[in-house]
Curated annotation (Swiss-Prot):
HAMAP family: Phosphoglyc_kinase
InterPro entries registered for this protein in UniProt: Phosphoglycerate_kinase (IPR001576), Phosphoglycerate_kinase_CS (IPR015911), Phosphoglycerate_kinase_N (IPR015824), Phosphoglycerate_kinase_sf (IPR036043)
EC number(s) per entry: 2.7.2.3
Protein origin, superkingdom: Bacteria
Record's protein name: Phosphoglycerate kinase
Residues at which substrate binds: D21, F22, N23, R37, H60, L61, G62, R63, R119, R152
Pfam families attached to this UniProt entry: PGK
Amino acid sequence: MKLRSIRDAEVRNKRVIVRVDFNVPLDAEGNVVDDFRIRAALPTIEYLVENGAKVILISHLGRPKGKRDKKYSLVGVAKRLAELLHKEILFAPDVVGEEVELAVNGLRSGDILLCENVRFHEEEEKNDAEFAKNIASLGEIFVNDAFSASHRAHATVEGITKFLPSYAGFLMEKEVNYLSMLTENPQRPYYLVLGGAKVSDKVALLQNLLPKVDGMVIGGAMVFTFWKAQGKEIGKSIVEDDLVGFAKELLEQATTQNKEIVLAKDFVVADENKEHVEIKAISDFGPADIGYDIGPESIKEFKNALVKARTVFWNGPLGLFEDAKFAEGTKQVGAFLADFPGTVVVGGGDTANAVREMELFEKFAHVSTGGGASLEFLEGKVLPGIAPLVVEG
């Protein structure tokens, strides 16, 4: 998939609208707690500034439901962006109207203007054409660098592309290049590492990627649905009964297609209060047991399977990572993948958070900024924010 790149646009002295995803956590004072997504957009912003563009940044934050709400303001984001760029960031209190028009008209080459939260207008999520046209009138070129919002057909993601020449920013290009590699031309052997609580989040992903991979290792609470499909006692562990049939079918397809599937088979088990912690094999589970993390045997088996791989896509923590008692599986497999000689791509918000917490971020080829967007891309869907950027032929 080839996208029209920002490199192909003549940006000098042009008003360039950049859709970024600055949907970051804030503290009670409105200060940025985690600037991962802001940092990810810096290469595009810096390129535009260096090349003399007048940069107009547009983002959403949270879900203010189409109403102005101070706790979802981007003022704190502007402050953090100024610190990261060592540069003044101008701030407009809206994305449409006289104030933002005056601010845009006053921009000089190399200036950066961040507009207030676009989701303060309900027209954004409705993909309202008139609203998109109004915002488009502020600029001469549109750049989408918000991969993580590109599975939404919103006014500043998809609608705006009908009114301006549209290009991909560097983050968008990087995301699409790495994720396309996973579906089109991975180095083999190619393995998935899957965790998290729900199979339901990954049904389409599994259906699309099973024929493309050489194997997968499955941990997290989702593995209990696979064990139930094989008739095992899983105690009170999380299970999706309506997907037991799907899990059974997937395991059968994997066998037919000669794919290696490694299910976590021992667990860090506790009761509902997360007390009385012990290690148990799946075959020893009692009716009250709950598995909260993969056990040492599973960690060893996962490593033995993954050591063969050249490409790995990891989506989902392997245990209840936010509780230190149940973080060992994610930590050990994460550390193993961080030292892995092949290409590892990490996708999903919880997995990215775990990788950052373990301070392994820089060790991976790519940590995707997109949770839902990266999964939908890997499911084979054409994302509404990306389709207008694709070079035909």
